[in-house]
Amino acid sequence: MDQSLSQQIKKEAQNLGFDLVGIAPAGEAPHWDRLREWVERGFHAGMEYIPRRLSTYRHPSGVLPGCRSLVMVAASYLPVPLANIPPGLGRIAAYATRTDYHTVLREKLRLLAGFIEALIPGTQTRPAVDTAPLMERSFGWLAGLGWIGKNTMLIHPQFGSYFLLGVVLTTAELPPDPPFSKNYCGRCQACLEVCPTGALVAPFTLDARRCISYWTIEAKTVPPARLRPFFDQWFFGCDLCQQVCPWNRRILRSGGVPGTESLLVVEARQLPPHVAMSEVLRASDSILRQWFRDTPLWRAKPAGLRRNAAIVLGNCLRKEMPSYENGCSNAAGRSDISPSNISSGSATPIGQLTSRSKRSPGDFPENAAQPLSPQAADWQDVLASALQDPDPCVRRAAAWALAGRPTLTVGSILHEVFARETDPEVRQEISALLSEISTASGSSAEGP
């Protein structure tokens, strides 16, 4: 194997703007057995494309027949400090605040693939950016780009976990780099402890059924009611397990890695890190497309974005309750939020959870008498309008959000909507909310 070929390929990757580059041999994917076990335990949630292509993940030849090497690259992106934001705004995960990374990285990877084919005549290549059935993080570790942390992210000593991976698979046999030699997580448990829904069920293990990022990006339905309060103001994705990682501390403090200029920063337009949720709910599909079409947010599509916005506003309304305790709690290790009771509905009622919204039935009459702030009144108006959205998931989320500040008016609106609603899941959601409002207010009125 010609070492000079590898050096030329790495140099070209750096010239194209990639921050890290390494070469991994094409063998059975490291940690494939763990992926299979992860799927068997149902941790993939609704991402059925993973078990459907599980055998393909086992070896890169399933992506490129005859593959012998993987050129792994990484492009860093800028973090967004987790500062307090005004109510009514939604947080966006840092990676999604710029032009879709698929667009930027794919073009650079095509150029790198063309360079490899010109350098080594007769070789075949295939570039990929997290859309092929390939265990990129495992091969990133194998190529020496970092270690896999307890938050399941690939972590590099200089860049932390604020980078995205790409790969060029090739039939050329290139000298491989050594795997990253050590895991520097040590005894740190910060990521497990900060996760509000307990999605990191163990070190290096993520249960997507509890993950805020899964529910706001990948899911096509509405998250379980018991999880929604823990989303707080996360509108798209979640960065909490990265924000607390000690290896990201310097990057967060300096706003990036000093002395580097990532292609994801130079060649991408900037989105604001926070978005007004009422505007998302008011916007037409065409307007949402205009705002988000070339960003990662478009993966959620208009219905998903409106669903997420409604949940954020519901949490903001709950924050206006006098009984609301504005603290940072988490569900890690809790016995009342588990895969079985999330799906079966047997978890402890929200009012009894150790969550941000500690309310009891006796609180509601007093709370209902409290005047709404002007912005909360606006949220209620836009949520009431969202009850007529054509997508049932949006209607479910809007009903739950509207009930975040239960009043006689809200009860009346929900009764009217229930009377005309035909979708069984939306009817079930509204029925449960009306029963909760009725019980909490001490009313003798019967539910629907």
What residue spans do the PLM features occupy?
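Leucine-rich solenoid repeat scaffolds
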Residues: 411-419, 423, 427-435
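Structural detector for internal amphipathic alpha-helices that build alpha-solenoid repeat scaffolds
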Residues: 307-319, 366-373, 385, 395-407, ...
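C-type cytochrome heme-c attachment and multiheme electron-transfer modules
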Residues: 255-317
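Auxiliary alpha/beta "docking" domains used to position bulky ligands
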Residues: 1-184, 223, 232
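Short inter-helical turns and helix N-cap capping residues of alpha-solenoid HEAT/ARM repeat scaffolds
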Residues: 302, 390-391, 422-423
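Iron-sulfur cluster-binding cysteine motifs and their immediate structural context
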Residues: 190-213, 220, 231-262
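Intrinsically disordered, low-complexity terminal tails and inter-domain linkers enriched
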Residues: 254-260, 318-377, 438-447
